[in-house]
Amino acid sequence: MKENTLRKTREALLMSKAELARAAKVSPITISRIENGLPCRMETKRKIILALGLKISDKDKIFHD
């Protein structure tokens, strides 16, 4: 199983799943699914990256497609 960078990044920022979901305008279930290794749409990835305060160019640091 791949290392879960989204979870580590979220926890390093002291954000709960609910806080990240609210900031990214996605459901907390979506955050859980992604953290458990399920795929998501590119638009969802974009929302999450921006909600974490990162740049779109940092996508590969969070999502290992």
What are these model-derived regions, one by one?
Residues N4-A23:
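Short basic helix-loop element that most often maps to the first helix and adjoining turn
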Residues A18, P28-I29, S57:
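Key DNA-contact positions within bacterial/archaeal DNA-binding proteins
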Residues M42-D60:
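DNA major-groove recognition helix of helix-turn-helix/homeodomain DNA-binding modules
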Residues S16, T30, T44:
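Ser/Thr-centric signal marking residues that sit
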Residues I62-D65:
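A short, Lys/Arg-enriched interface patch at domain edges and termini
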Residues K25-C40:
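Recognition helix of helix-turn-helix/homeodomain-like DNA-binding domains
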